[in-house]
Amino acid sequence: SKVMVNLDDLPFVHSDMEIDMLGDAYEFLIGRFAATAGKKAGEFYTPQQVSKILAKIVTDGKDKLRHVYDPTCGSGSLLLRVGKETQVYRYFGQERNNTTYNLARMNMLLHDVRYENFDIRNDDTLENPAFLGHTFDAVIANPPYSAKWTADSKFENDERFSGYGKLAPKSKADFAFIQHMVHYLDDEGTMAVVLPHGVLFRGAAEGVIRRYLIEEKNYLEAVIGLPANIFYGTSIPTCILVFKKCRQQEDNVLFIDASNDFEKGKNQNHLSDAQVERIINTYKRKETIDKYSYSATLQEIADNDYNLNIPRYVDTFEEEAPIDLDQVQQDLKNIDKEIAEIEQEINAYLKELGVLKDE
């Protein structure tokens, strides 16, 4: 309601305005509201620069998409960002929160997406999935981090989760979202998801699922580490995982450490256009760049017991310059000499004032 009240205050003249302007204004106000909404902001909005990275990844090399799917679509901003990068015929999404679900539908209409070209459902994605039997050219999401779910035994026979040998733990649904998204990904499609760093190294059931995705399926394409404090409502560092079912470079996984590339803000860090482009260009070229990115072999990942923690692959350590002890000693002598000279000057002034007498 706050978004709509602010939108109503804007001096629009419909006859002079394209529908895109109204949609962009709505998107802008959602972003402004997210900036003041605290933890709740993460439930419905992904910062534009992060959305841009995800969208460019899933549209890489494609001049059109038949469909794009976001299983936790929030206000729909991530879906719409994909449409800015390439032509999208149909948008699919699911959102549990009723208010946010309505935000998403309104966002679609205000961006001139015809009603028959989008299908947004209001339900719990993991517990009551929509669109079963469908696969999508692009699957994209910024799901709630380490959310709880039932992990009910019935899911052991669910086609989204069966075959992995384990279900994601009740206390952390991160890998349940990954499994769900992989299931909906077309054989020629690309999937990109934002998650906390814990998915890279946590063990037990999550370790089993992670190993299966890499060793058995070989779906993992890239791991991109993002800076901390760039999302609304949380300061934890996050990463982007990219999956493909038909990979061109089947023997390598690209690791990018962009955690130190950010612009410091008063309350929140953000990515500049140049920093976003560096991530995208490195991903496209699959480049190894000193202290920034590394193309690891599957054998290297296996040797690390399928632990994907980025510092294991990208060494960002900066060696300190060697200390010249002789120079340090000389500097200390010079400082002592300067102090002695200053003390002499002070004593001379004090004697002139009669404050200090000759001994």
Predicted regions and their residues:
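A conserved structural/catalytic subdomain of Rossmann-like adenosyl-cofactor enzymes
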Residues: P129, G133-E359
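SAM-dependent transferase fold signal centered on methyltransferase-like domains
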Residues: V3-N6, L54, M191
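Conserved S-adenosyl-L-methionine
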Residues: K40-A141, S146-F155, F161-Y164, F175-A176, ...
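Residue-level signature of catalytic and energy-coupling elements of molecular machines
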Residues: A25, L54, A104, L241, ...
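Conserved phosphate/pyrophosphate-binding and hydrolysis machinery centered on Walker-type P-loop NTPases
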Residues: S15-G23, K40-Q48, S171
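Conserved adenine-nucleotide phosphate-binding loops and their immediately adjacent elements
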Residues: A35-K39
